[in-house]
Amino acid sequence: MGQDENSAATRAQDREKETLILSNSPVTTCIKFRLRSLFDVEASQTNGKPLAHSLSAASPWSPTGQGGVLRLKRFARRVNRWGEQPEMCGIAGYSHSVPRDRNRLSRALDSIAHRGPDQQGEFHSSSISLGARRLRVIDIEGGDQPFSTADGNITLVFNGEIFNHRELRTELEQAGHRFRSKSDTEVVLAAFQQWGNVAFRKLRGMFAAALWVSSERRLILARDRMGIKPLYYCMQDGEIYFGSEIKCILTHHEVSRRLSLAGLNCYLSLNYVPGPHTMIHGIFKLMPGHLLEWRNRNAQVFSYLASRTKDHAPASLNEASEELDALLGSAIREQLDADVPLGIWLSGGLDSSTLLHYASAFSPSTLKTFSITFNGRSFDDGAYIREVSRNYGTEHAELNLDSDCNLIEAIEAIAYHADEPNADAGAIPVWFLSQMTRRNATVALSGEGADELFGGYLTHKADRYAAIAHRIPEWLRKGAYACAQMLPVSDEKIGFEYKAKRFLKGSLLSPEYAHIYWNGTFSEPEKADLFHYADARPLAQILNGMKSGSGLERFLQFDQRYYLPDDILAKVDRMSMAHAVEVRPPFLDPRIVDFAAGLPEHFKLNRAGSKLVLRNLMRNKLPKAVLTRPKTGLDIPIHEWFRGVLRPLLEDTLNEESIRRDGLFRWPVVRSLLEQHQARKGNWGYHLWGLLTLTIWMRRWAIEAPNRWTPAPLPQEEVAVADSSLHWQPVWSSAEIS
């Protein structure tokens, strides 16, 4: 079952069009960028003449001048590698036991055109339709998708990039494979041919992939081990629908838009929807490090990670730091490899400053850095950001995000691109940061993952302190919490009042519930008061895995399995891809993940502080103020904005008519939250943000809410959804293939 015969003609037409639009293509943009970095001259200065004629022969930047030959050789090596670079894209597909309108696939791909605006490719057989949207970085033809084996038996659509694709290419060539392109997509395809499902353990990168094996009538979906790239699926009447974003699946009229009560129960507690749940009944996330195999109208989900024992831990903190030094250097060097403008998201904190330190050592040109700043002493990190930027001489751009920015328009756009509501208000600054980045760069390095690997969050410190607090009689802890309630309300970012109230209440909970409460919003009693369909079972099932661990590690594993992919990485992927920006997180290189998992806890967190191995590594490298500053995160003054610029949006959206019509929440409770917040009797900004984004998202996607007048218990299939995806498997348990 080969590709549709029309696809070849379509590609031929596309190639003809490419000759007409080349002057505005990504290739031309890339050439201009590379020429500027090589010769320090704008392409427009050549006035259409050969570059050598536009530069003085005496100029050191001339091809015949001092250093020019070396620069041309370097440029030639770059050109020779063009096509090896990965590309951003999105994928979609569906099965069909009966013939269907092929425009279905086009509609699904159109919904994610922002992920890959340059090329659309489709594959159709009697059983399956696969498609991809691609943002071409360099290779105009060689990397176009779908990509099939020479015999046409296996077809692949792929989103992401494989950083070790050159190593794998060499290994596969030695095994007899011959390549037709320099694309990493073809390397993934050949790896699957060679090793089958085991191939996914060998991939070092970020990806979501779909492969169709025609001879076996088998579809395989795969997602990278940390969940950097998203992949969703839906099974209905024996057919499967999948895509990089939920909106791909919603283009199919058979797919219900019914609200998932299990997803909403988790969302109200966690601020995000943990996999495999989504906020739409019947649509699921493929869990990180998992495969889905669909055959004969049935699907099976399982982990492709291989269990192994932890490596021998370093004997000392200095030894651990030396090992991390080598791993970080290798990962960042790999991820700097791009023939398009590249920058670094700089927060002025330890993680992003570390990336900049290494990148500056490897980059031959001035690095670009991008930052968001805020008004207000507790929210503004500008002083740290600018100090780090000056130290490394970056070409720096920053945006002060205040009430004058078009916040309401951004919130509406976020509701479209986010696919699911996310009560993490950090989506707003990431939206504006991505927007600013796109004007200057196509790729950005970012520090996601370091906190989850090395114990960098305030919640990890709170977990440690709570273990001590539990030795204090409960009546005394309750008394301390009652006293904390009398503290005056403060709008400071993670101020003393907020931390005291949150910690003392969490100290009255079990360790598992305390961990999520410190980072979430509604406690279980608060949720029961608010939500007509409150049910503790979905969250309890998610938390069960945390009970099997001990100490810090169980909390880190939970954060890596759920919080990182379903909140942090999901937020970054949707906001950046909405602007066609690729964000790379070097800390999530599998080698660093395995290294972190093998470290003893006291190399991560102890009385001396957090992320100790990383701080020790960067000692005497970064400014002391950066090394010693407390963790704050990219947060916004949402409490203040809800009393000011966003108050009309808040009150127009969460009004009595709207709340009663949806039938999800009790209006008196919502009204009380609104009134207490405006009267400064409590800071309910985070809680209200979660309800606001949920309501806007439901309106935008016409999501069907259950009728409050006919309440029913949570469907059992939502409680026990995708059990094979919920088994507790540490994400570090990857093994080299022997």
Regions found by a protein language model. Give the residues of each.
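Active-site adenylate/phosphate-handling loop in enzymes that bind or generate adenylated species
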Residues: 225, 431-491, 563, 568, ...
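Intrinsic-disorder-associated, low-complexity terminal segments enriched in Asp/Asn/His/Tyr and depleted
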Residues: 4-6, 14, 24, 53, ...
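Cysteine-centered catalytic environments shared across enzyme families
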Residues: 86-418, 430, 434, 619-620, ...
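N-terminal amphipathic/hydrophobic targeting modules at extreme N-termini
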Residues: 1-4, 22-23, 35, 40-41, ...
